[in-house]
Amino acid sequence: MLQPKRMKFRKMFKGRNRGLANGTEVSFGEFGLKAVGRGRLTARQIEAARRAMTRHIKRQGQIWIRVFPDKPITSKPLEVRMGKGKGNVEYWVCQIQPGKVLYEMNGVSEELAREAFTLAAAKLPLKTTFVTKSVM
């Protein structure tokens, strides 16, 4: 699963997921899966969607993952009293703003790409849409 190799600080503030997205265009492949809603993806969800797409296209074509989980989420163990410091890092997430391209695909037909992205979208907690590369 995806997670940073090293970080300057182990734990992070909760923060707020506001603002506009970077990476709103399809840059590497022909087709993309774009987030319509706002939320956060865990490393497990990113990997589950990737596996679903890879299995559906039967290892032909190429897939790019355009998001990376770089925010640690902590939690305290069950039945532990409040206080005594922040909990341990449990998992990693990536904060998603509307318009962010999550995955890209190349080397497959549009129909196959649509089906693969539909399977991937079922694994994600966000509303997504299918996009194609805009040629100017």
UniProtKB/Swiss-Prot annotation:
InterPro entries with a match to the protein in the record: Ribosomal_uL16, Ribosomal_uL16_bact-type, Ribosomal_uL16_CS, Ribosomal_uL16_dom, Ribosomal_uL16_sf
Pfam family, one: Ribosomal_L16
Swiss-Prot/TrEMBL keywords: Ribonucleoprotein, Ribosomal protein, RNA-binding, rRNA-binding, tRNA-binding
Gene3D superfamilies with a match to the protein in the record: Ribosomal protein L10e/L16
One cellular component term from this protein's GO annotations in UniProt: cytosolic large ribosomal subunit
Keyword Ribosomal protein recorded: yes
The UniProt record lists the keyword Ribonucleoprotein: yes
Domain of life: Bacteria
GO MF, any single term: rRNA binding
GO terms under biological process: translation
UniProt family annotation: Belongs to the universal ribosomal protein uL16 family.
Subunit structure: Part of the 50S ribosomal subunit.
Entry-linked NCBIfam families: rplP_bact
Known function: Binds 23S rRNA and is also seen to make contacts with the A and possibly P site tRNAs.
Stated name of the protein: Large ribosomal subunit protein uL16
UniProt organism field: Shewanella pealeana (strain ATCC 700345 / ANG-SQ1)
Chain's gene name: rplP
